[in-house]
């Protein structure tokens, strides 16, 4: 029986051909994601640099019990919050207007989560600064060698994970995440030393509590670095993996 449907060739209807042409034309006029991806990635990196600077500034305020420096860190946290809001809006716009799929979509979803983690790191840095501000009336904590070491290590891990993100380097991301154990070890040493100091003299209870809070916030920054490493693994492999079991 001969079909009443017009044909453009064996097994291919005119409707099929028209659908193919329409799909190809849409693909041709669709703006490339490359430019949007670069813009987003660059903005994420700038946000990451802000976070690293905040961690180091909070450290200086903590070491020197500098109330004014602490206040600057607390106030500057709004810059990180604004950056996260801008980036989240930009990513949502790109997803809505360009409808990315597969790896492009994973890239955007991963970066959206990275901005959230960076914003929380900024909050933790501001919390360290708040503890430093409360310590302003006490002598600088000379014995706490581990605390500056812990802060510098967390800042270095932030820098390292941003490098892994730039290169979309799964191996580098895993190596950075593995160093979170070093942060945890420093935290436990600070915890034990501080408790010993607090038991020895009740006058040390208040400053000791501030030190413990500051160390806790730094430890949380290390955990969030691991979360970003998991985002990079997801971006590369499409698999969700727990790097801090």
Residue spans of the language-model regions?
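Cytosolic, long alpha-helical scaffolding segments
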Residues: 1-245
């Amino acid at each position: 029986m001969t079909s009443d449907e017009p044909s453009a060739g064996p097994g291919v209807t005119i409707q099929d051909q028209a659908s193919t042409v329409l799909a190809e034309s849409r693909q041709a006029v669709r703006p490339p994601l490359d430019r949007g991806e670069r813009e987003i990635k660059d903005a994420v990196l700038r946000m990451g640099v802000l976070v690293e600077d905040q961690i180091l500034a909070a450290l200086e305020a903590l070491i020197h019990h500098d109330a004014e420096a602490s206040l600057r860190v607390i106030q500057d946290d709004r810059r990180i919050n604004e950056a996260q809001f801008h980036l989240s809006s930009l990513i949502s716009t790109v997803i809505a207007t360009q409808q990315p799929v597969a790896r492009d979509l994973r890239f955007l979803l991963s970066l959206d989560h990275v901005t959230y983690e960076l914003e929380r790191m900024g909050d933790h840095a501001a919390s360290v600064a708040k503890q430093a501000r409360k310590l302003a009336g006490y002598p600088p904590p000379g014995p706490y060698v581990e605390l500056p070491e812990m802060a510098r290590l967390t800042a270095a891990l932030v820098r390292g994970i941003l490098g892994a993100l730039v290169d979309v380097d799964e191996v580098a991301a895993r190596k950075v995440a593995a160093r979170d154990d070093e942060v945890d070890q420093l935290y436990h040493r600070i915890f034990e030393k501080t408790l010993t100091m607090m038991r020895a003299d009740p006058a040390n209870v208040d400053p000791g509590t501030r030190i413990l809070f500051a160390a806790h916030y730094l430890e949380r920054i290390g955990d969030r670095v691991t979360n970003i490493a998991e985002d990079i693994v997801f971006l590369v492999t499409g698999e969700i993996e727990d790097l801090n079991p």
